[in-house]
A protein has these predicted regions:
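M16 family metallopeptidases and their MPP-like homologs
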Residues: 1, 23-48, 70-76, 132-142, ...
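A conserved hydrophobic secondary-structure block that centers on an alpha-helix together
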Residues: 45-71
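A structural signal for the main folded, soluble domain(s) of proteins
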Residues: 56-57, 82-85, 89, 97-106, ...
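Glycine-rich, charged/polar anion/phosphate-binding loops
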Residues: 59, 115-124, 142, 180-183, ...
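An aromatic/glycine/proline-enriched structural segment found at the starts
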Residues: 72-132, 223-226, 244, 329-333, ...
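C-terminal regions of mature proteins
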Residues: 77, 233-390, 394-398
Length: 515
């Protein structure tokens, strides 16, 4: 008894994904640019279509594509490669026959003219629809196999949309096109694309949105990109590459994923995405030769393979879809005979029993488990050299840093009056984000990014190994730069510490410095 309903882990997860405006926007952009190929489909499954997938179709898809012949095997680390390959062959590959699997991701044929689409996303009944739309200008920019061009577009994204005073973002915000403006460059797929998005926009200003973008890009081509912004973008990207700081993720895992960005489409150059030093060197040569301006003209202005997407909020959209699904299931239930209804109940009960049955212990043993004895007990030796330089303690650590020098300045706070402690949080938030004697804030940011890997201030407290009550507090200034530019790093830190303009109104402080 009761109505029919759909339920499932992936089904419910994808229903949630299809209700997020950012996810809906990204999906609609992909669909608009690649309507005829894989990228125009939803990899996780569209909730409207997931129930149509039969179990037999699911198994057939798995048999076809989830096979070693369609796999990419990647090993990372210092190892006996022959022994590892022999292990993989004996324990895995030798159990399968070689198959031909056609899993090539083909390219979308270019458009004759840009597509113009209007889509919807759901909002709550209490949420306003006014000035709550998304406007997106997106263009396909070639393939991921051209690492020089891909890296250049990452830098263009920085120069046009991310750096302080970025011309594209500034022009749209100054015109009131959206409450926020951002962009992205997607190079993790075969055909890459660049987009500019205005969030919280009036859909009636779509033509103005496009016009401003094209005017700024045209002016940029004619007058040239700010050289300092390009230099900062190249330096920023090179630093990210050299540091390879992937937070809690293993470096080998991320390298493997980066390699797939090229390897999936080009067997001849699998390591192109992780061999970028020559690319950065080449871009430094090209930055004053019109290369970046030519990319803007060719791909962002003269390229018809793109779309202008308007994503509008729609109150009641979720309820309307739910009602349509309810009516569909009610109609299906009404079409069933009593015998068919009984069979449906029986299948549901069998499925629930299968789901609740504990896993076979023998099957569980197939999953490899990390044991305590597998973990190396020896730690990496840590050494430092303590020096006295003009009465200050200097700790020097010699470690491999891929050509980057790191500097930490620690200022002891033991003599700071208690009533001034709350101001430390404010001080660390404004240093590096206000004008100095020789730079405006925007110029300072570009100079820091062009010459260094960043300068950050903070407050740090260190406890004592032998006492929970003992501690020392420091105000820290941390910076990093390529070895040849460590003197510039010191210069920029002195500029920030000694000449930052710390006289501002409460309005400036709250609205601009620490928004």
């Amino acid at each position: 008894e009761g109505p029919l309903t759909y339920n499932g882990v992936v089904y419910n997860e994808m229903k949630g994904a299809f209700s997020s405006p950012d996810d809906v926007l990204e999906r609609d952009i992909m669909n608009s640019l690649f309507p005829d190929i894989t990228y125009g489909c939803e990899s996780g499954g569209d909730p409207d279509n997931i129930p149509e997938l039969s179990y037999e179709e699911f198994l057939e898809f798995h048999r076809t594509y989830y096979h070693p012949s369609n796999s990419y095997i990647y090993l990372y680390g210092n190892m006996d490669m022959a022994a590892k390959l022999d292990f993989i062959d004996r324990n895995y590959l030798s159990a399968f026959d070689s198959l031909y699997v056609d899993s090539e991701i083909r390219e979308q044929q270019p458009f004759d003219k840009m597509h113009d689409l209007v889509m919807e996303y759901p909002v709550a009944e209490s949420e306003s629809e006014e000035n709550n739309s998304y406007l997106a200008y997106s263009v396909v920019t070639g393939t991921a196999m051209d690492t020089l061009k891909c890296t250049a577009f990452d830098i263009l994204d920085y120069a046009l949309l991310s750096t302080p005073g970025a011309p594209l973002k500034k022009a749209l915000l100054d015109a009131g096109i959206g409450s926020d403006v951002y962009g992205s460059y997607e190079d993790g797929i075969r055909q890459t694309y660049f987009d500019v998005v205005a969030k919280g926009a009036d859909p009636g200003r779509k033509e103005e949105f496009v016009s401003i973008i094209r005017k700024v890009l045209t002016d940029t081509v004619e007058n040239g990109i700010d050289p300092k912004a390009l230099e900062a973008g190249i330096n920023y990207m090179e630093f990210r590459y050299r540091e390879a700081d992937f937070s809690s993720y293993p470096k080998g895992l991320i390298y493997g994923l980066d390699i797939l960005d090229n390897w999936l489409y080009d067997d001849e150059h699998p390591f192109a995405q992780v061999q970028l030093i020559p690319v950065f060197d080449k871009l430094k040569e090209l930055k004053n030769q019109g290369y970046f301006e030519d990319l803007i003209q060719r791909y962002l202005l003269d390229n018809p393979h793109g779309s202008v997407l308007t994503l509008n909020p729609s109150r009641g959209l979720t309820a309307r879809k739910a009602k349509a699904l309810e009516d569909k299931l009610d109609a299906y239930l009404s079409s069933l005979s009593e015998e068919e209804k009984t069979e449906l109940v029986k299948k549901t009960a069998n499925l629930e029993q299968y789901q609740e049955t504990p896993e076979d212990p023998e099957a569980a043993k197939c999953i490899p488990m990390l044991k305590r004895e597998d973990i190396r007990k020896e730690i990496t030796p840590f050494t430092n050299e303590a020096l006295d330089i003009d009465g200050s303690l200097f700790l020097y650590h010699e470690v491999p840093t891929n050509g980057i020098g790191y500097l930490d300045l620690m200022f002891d706070l033991k003599d700071l009056a208690d009533e001034k402690i709350p101001y430390l949080g404010l001080l660390k938030s404004v240093l590096g984000y206000v004008d100095t004697a020789h730079y405006t804030y925007g110029e300072l940011t570009n100079e820091i990014n062009a010459q260094t890997g960043g300068i950050m201030c903070g407050v740090e407290v260190f406890d004592h190994a032998d006492s929970v009550d003992a501690f020392r507090a420091f105000f820290s200034v941390r910076g990093k730069a390529m070895y040849p530019k460590t003197d510039v790093l010191f210069k920029m830190i002195r500029e920030i510490i000694n000449t930052s303009s710390l006289k501002f109104t409460t309005e400036d402080l709250i609205g601009k410095v620490i928004p």
